[in-house]
């Protein structure tokens, strides 16, 4: 192997063009592949910007040509030469009009044969890719999202700074508090028996910053949650966090619509239309069966309860007698595609989300096949068809339940399943909206008490202030989520800045005065010295980048992601530690068999 000597990079591989033809330049990187054509050698040199073809021929110095003959994939080199127009141009790479005729070559590092080919068109086991993540990240399809993620972060920083925000880091070792997911705990060596928690979000500290007079704060923060992994979750993730004083929810939404507009324009050259639609939570659940509705397609849910008032169809009658509801969707024109077998599968989807079953009617040219219509009167059939604008070729799908949210949620998932399987979603659309007016509380059967739907510091709607303790289920929050194509991209709320109201919230959530002070005493004390009205929100950066780049998983936009068991295959984390480390921390392990 050689050193770089006096050679230093003058150009990046992916940034040269015909405008540079005739120039002497020095480039460096890894050999993507080399081809010896007998008397002429071609090699594709890859760096972080792209690929440039190198050429070695009869005019190349003999010692350089000899080195070129030894080149193999992933050898790391630096070379100097003259850029020329390429005779056989290609549009497969951005630099397909030019090639570099090499006059000087230094091989800086050799490479073993890789366990898989480093090109985009491969079918490789995910475990192998993650074990050799440093190789996987060399592939352009994996490398580019990480580079674009960096650019996105820079745009975010620039935007916030232009709008008078101050970037402030909050602590990573903090006090563990209730009302969230499970904390990652860090034992203190100097205070035996005491533990820090890794932050699930900077929530308390950013509110304290508003009480500290900073007015507008942002941070690209690392956050940690010890929860089971799903396709869109990681135990450690990056959050774009913000907070503002002396604002309303309208001000916060306007600032964030500006951020989205800037990002989509600079990164994707797409003009996003603002302001976004604002949809109350009740409407989102009622029309789409989701608090993060995908509005790129129809199949909206409709309330057909009135159609069946007085019905003798026993399943519906029992639900209505108990004060329940009947909801439906019309899968228009899909009767030929939704067979009985397909509908049975949709029924399983509905049951997975709490429905007791899925009633259906297929309206075909050969007649109607239905699981319930024979029990209906002609008037009920006519009213149902009119309510759903039903005609030949349609499929009507109904769910009944005493809980309208459960009925809509089940149909919402059926709606998504149909759309995904039958090509109803335009992948090129970016449909943004705000979901607003969330419930302030949700009841936990497991805990046997009311829980904060967002967190205990969320401001109730003004008209609900008197109900916080007397009727928690009727209260709504000054809270808002930004939704893109059926995915919650971020969310936030206005915060409570009245100590007396905060005490009432803690009481409604079942906190004793002692427990509230133990967990949040420092925030409650800060309120005593004057607290401006404030609010904010946060985005999951990983999810935002995934949506912008149309990736299937957030793992594709994270350099070193965790897997399903929260492990990191490349390094082997988490790992056991030696006995002395545990002794220093005053920790003894008890392992279950």
Placement of each model-derived feature along the sequence:
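Class II aminoacyl-tRNA synthetase catalytic cores and aaRS-like
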Residues: 1-593
